Amino acid sequence: SYSMCVPEYDYQKSKNPRRALTKNSKPCHNGGYDNEVYDYILYVNDILGTEENKKYLVLDILGQGTFGQVVKCQNLKTQEIVAVKVIKARQECLQQSIAEGNVLEYIDKKVDPKYKKYFIDLKDKFMHKYHLCLVFKLLSSNLYEIIKQNHHHGLCIKLVRNFAAQILEALCALKEIKIIHCDLKPENILLAKLNKPDLKVIDFGSACEEHQLLYSYVQSRFYRSPEVILGVDYSTSVDMWSFGCIVAELFLGLPLLPGTSEYEQLARMVQTFGMPPSWMMVEKKASNYVVKQDNPSYDYFNDKSGGRYSYRLKTLDEFNREFNLHESPAKQYFCDTKLDKIVMIYRLPKKNMPRDAVDREMHERSCLVHFLKGVLNISPLERWTPQEALQHPFITEEPWTGHWAPPTARFSSDIRRGGRSLSLV
């Protein structure tokens, strides 16, 4: 050892240089504890927390985002390995994370016990040098990582069905207590353990109560609903749109609607599902993307003639000229734009499958297409609820005859249509 060569050398473990885990570890704010973007500068073997039963030894970094960082830690009292979310010392991040903690506690208190297994547990929360720390059970890979590990090839229908049913159960629970997640995506759905397909929904930082909408700009773009893009007041149905996009991505291995901007996201929706109904076009935000025109077939005395006005999506050239932009046509991931074709002609799970196996696969795909059309209805008034979707043959595995409609009455849920409150019944 070094002390044998230099006997007078006094080695002290405490003087070892610490390995920084935070990407930008240059001290800038908060007495040198924070970097320039107000992230707490984390090092291996740091101790988070000061109270005796709330001390956590930092082991490794798990992730970093706009809210802050997630680190793998060990509870020094119980020896349990946990995930600690260390929030940035910025007011907007702090407020959003306090709200997340409140939502998780509300879910734990209000949700039916049979649904609790689908949500991440908030084990502890505390302040550390002006940073809010949220402590969670350490989970495994998220669904995006599962897709990536599969080389962006789709998962088998059996596993897609298993995952879809669990997410729907979680959405049933949220709908019953009138909570909207507002950021459902593959990254926010995690396996509890790597060797079991049990899922948990995480990241309630954007969540809100139905009828108390906190933000107009919600949902990650690929999973953003048409009503959010068009500025219509939204409900729990936005989570069902995100759910449909996730299920399609699990099967296809790639995002169904990978828009590069809000305009392009809406354009992809229109290509795949058609134009949204006219009542969704009345908000000011919609005028950024659509052109209003007189409806030549309008008849005041004939309800079936349509409204006084009709709408069409602006062309890319029109949109670029109006806003002085230079957006170019986006890359197409699939060889068709219609949902039926995208799903039905997607690669088979195995080469040289027997004819009867191919027939069974195509029959199941037909059922999947029908299911996706119900949860991805472009009108939130007609989109299926999680309770309805759970009864679809794709989930129940009942014989698929080619036709199905939700057998139950709609749960009441207010939504605004051009300033008037409607009830989904």
Residue ranges of model-derived segments:
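C-terminal intrinsically disordered, low-complexity extensions immediately downstream
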Residues: 400-425
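A conserved loop-to-beta-strand element in the N-lobe of protein kinase catalytic cores
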Residues: 128-137, 144-145
